[in-house]
């Protein structure tokens, strides 16, 4: 699943906002999803309240967003291999929003 990050003030639901549901997915954040079908939409982490991570697949034109790296490569299903030359990180990038390679406890 491809995610992109934007400042919270730039994130706007253009339709279907009444169908969005939220749940606490970890000790450090929550996720939003479609209440009708369960499609994952976005996530927010408590230590970065000014940022929203959202699924690129939810965009009307997802091809306008190009990936810059892969995270959690150690969890990749062995038969799924991409042929790009993008950097791969076992977990988070070390500079991912100050997480230093792992989310806080």
Language model segments and positions:
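A short Gly-Trp-Pro
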Residues: 1-105
């Amino acid at each position: 699943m491809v995610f992109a990050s934007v400042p919270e003030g730039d994130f706007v639901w253009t339709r279907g906002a009444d169908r969005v549901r939220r749940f606490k997915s970890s000790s450090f954040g929550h996720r939003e999803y479609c209440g009708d079908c369960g499609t994952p939409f976005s996530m927010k982490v408590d230590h970065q309240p000014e940022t929203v991570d959202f699924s690129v697949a939810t965009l009307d034109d997802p091809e306008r967003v190009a990936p810059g790296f892969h995270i959690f490569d150690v969890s990749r299903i062995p038969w799924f291999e991409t042929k790009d030359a993008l950097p791969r990180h076992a977990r988070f990038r070390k500079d991912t929003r100050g997480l230093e390679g792992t989310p806080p406890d």
